[in-house]
A protein has these predicted regions:
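Short, flexible, mixed-charge acidic loops at enzyme active sites
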Residues: 129-138
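Conserved Class I S-adenosyl-L-methionine-dependent methyltransferase catalytic core
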Residues: 1-5
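General small-molecule cofactor/ligand-binding pocket signal
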Residues: 70-72, 171-174
C-alpha cells in the first residue's frame, strides 16, 4: 500500500530499487518495522522515536541486516535537521501524542512541498474503543492496558481540518482492517476502527 502510493504519487518507475534517492522520515519508528523495508527498496531512511529503548533495538536490527538507516531518539517537534523529506510515515502514532496540532505542524515543516505524508491512526468511534481498547488491551491482551487513550483518537474529519491549517491536503482516505485468522492487515472501505 505504502510503496504503491509513493510510486504513483511521486511518479517513480517500479525498478529493482524503486525508492532510490527518496528521503523518508519514519516517525514513531519503533524497532524499524517500516524503516527496514523502505531502506531495502532503496530509500534514504531516518527513523525517529521518543523511546530510547526502541531506537536501540532498531539500530541493532539495522546493523545486523546491514541496512544504512539513521535512527534518533526524538520527536518531530524537537528534531533538528536541514533535510526536507519526500515521504513522512506517521503510522499508528497520532493517537499517542499530547498535541496533535503541534505534532502535525512540525511534520509539515519537515515535508517537501510536493511530498507525501501517510497518517494511519484509530478513529474516534465506539467500535474503535471496543476493538482497540477493550478487545486488544483487556480481552486479548495483545497490548499492555493503558496503551491507548480513547480521548486521543482522531476522527478523519478532524484530521483533515488540522492538515488544512498546514497547507496539507488529503489525497485518499482508506479503512484498514485486521484479519485475526490470517494475522494480516488489508485495505477496507470500513474506516470505523483504523484508517490511513
Amino acid at each position: 500500500y505504502i510503496k504503491e502510493n509513493i510510486l504513483s504519487t511521486l511518479n517513480l518507475k517500479n525498478k529493482k530499487k524503486p525508492l532510490e534517492k527518496i528521503k523518508i522520515l519514519d516517525i514513531g519508528c519503533g524497532g524499524g518495522l517500516l524503516s527496514e523495508p523502505m531502506s531495502r527498496l532503496g530509500a534514504e531512511v531516518i527513523g525517529i522515536d521518543a523511546s530510547d529503548k526502541n531506537i536501540k533495538v532498531a539500530k541493532l536490527h539495522a546493523k545486523k541486516n546491514d541496512l544504512h538507516i539513521k535512527y534518533y531518539c526524538t520527536s518531530p517537534e524537537n528534531f533538528i535537521t536541514k533535510t526536507k523529506f519526500d515521504v513522512i510515515l506517521n503510522m499508528e502514532i497520532i493517537e499517542h501524542v499530547e498535541d496533535v496540532n503541534n505534532f502535525l505542524e512540525s511534520c509539515s515543516r519537515l515535508l517537501k512541498k510536493k511530498g507525501i505524508m501517510f497518517v494511519a491512526t484509530l478513529n474516534k468511534t465506539l467500535k474503535s474503543y471496543l476493538f482497540a481498547i477493550v478487545g486488544a488491551e483487556y480481552i486479548l491482551q495483545w497490548l499492555p492496558i493503558g496503551t491507548h487513550e480513547w480521548n486521543k483518537f482522531v476522527k478523519p474529519e478532524d484530521l483533515i481540518n488540522i492538515l488544512k491549517k498546514y497547507n496539507l491536503k488529503l489525497d485518499s482516505l482508506d479503512g484498514m482492517k485486521f484479519n485475526i485468522i490470517k494475522d494480516e492487515w488489508s485495505v477496507s472501505s470500513d474506516k470505523s476502527i483504523n484508517y490511513i
